[in-house]
Amino acid sequence: MTMTAAVVREFGKPLVIEEVPVPQPGPGQVLIKYEATGVCHTDLHAAKGDWPVRPNPPFIPGHEGVGYVAKLGAEVTRLKEGDRVGVPWLHTACGCCTPCRTGWETLCGSQQNTGYSVDGTFAQYGLADPDFVGRLPARLEFGPAAPVLCAGVTVYKGLKETEVRPGEWVLVSGIGGLGHMAVQYAKAMGMHVAAADIFPDKLALAEKLGADLVVDARAPDAVEEVQRRTGGLHGALVTAVSPKAMEQAYSMLRSKGTMALVGLPPGQICLPVFDTVLKRITVRGSIVGTRQDLEEALEFAGEGKVAAHFSWDKIENINAIFERMEEGKIDGRIVLDLNG
């Protein structure tokens, strides 16, 4: 039995749409029949091989897969055939190291990642660890669920990492595929939201989604305006892939403010040591989320409090999608229909 998949055979070259064998689950594995999968910027980096740790071609990218459990391997008891699940970036972790034992499996040094170190979700079928898939709420359809598997859980965890409490101010910098979901999660979590971007249509979207304050990041008085309107932000989540955006967000914080970074631009950021020390500013990175974070992020979406803006496409168009992604021409998220 074969399936259609998008395969990276050589870094920097177009993905190849081909028929490959359907994998069979071994002990402790499940076979997932994918109905849909989101497309993430990480998939583009995987295909280009431009991150310090690279995958090994040939491989199948993708890590926002949603579908049904099609087959159980031996010793699997947590799931049953027909269960609706999502397969995220974190394919598996060791469960034994200090990060794993303290609730930080996303920092496990032995973790495996879907669509990177193991074949991913740009295919009609795939293998998963039953302990690391997310159960989809009954009210959440496959299309809206797919972006939650990476974009959603990433910004949800990032917002938690800002330590902003209900009624306090948080900045969402960059209202793209991640940022538009971050605005919704932040509002659902009871935060006051300031949204910053350089494009008027993105700011209009943020306002439509409930942002309390929208800021043109190019305005020379952007920092002063935020400080005046909010008294300084309690926290900031930077999704923008820009060191300048990170530095600007830092300048908008009040004393004891926390900035969480989820964007991965090249280069470095320059932050003032004096202000960091005297104002007790915290700057931290945040990467995806744990299994518990994923469950919570999916529940928000299942309750209708968060809804990704996405458009459907076909796996055969993946190379054109990557081109549009590189050019910054994608609004919201892309979800591939894997039934076509």
Curated annotation (Swiss-Prot):
Its cofactor is Zn(2+). Zn(2+) binds at residues 40, 63. It comes from the Bacteria. GO terms for molecular function: alcohol dehydrogenase (NAD+) activity; zinc ion binding. Binds 1 zinc ion per subunit. Transmembrane segments: none annotated. The keyword Isomerase does not apply. SMART domains: PKS_ER. The keyword Membrane does not apply. Keywords: Metal-binding, NAD, Oxidoreductase, Plasmid, Zinc. It catalyses: a primary alcohol + NAD(+) = an aldehyde + NADH + H(+); a secondary alcohol + NAD(+) = a ketone + NADH + H(+). It is an enzyme of class 1 (oxidoreductase). Gene3D superfamilies: Medium-chain alcohol dehydrogenases, catalytic domain, NAD(P)-binding Rossmann-like Domain. Its EC number is 1.1.1.1. Belongs to the zinc-containing alcohol dehydrogenase family. This is Alcohol dehydrogenase. The lineage of its organism: Bacteria, Pseudomonadati, Pseudomonadota, Alphaproteobacteria, Hyphomicrobiales.
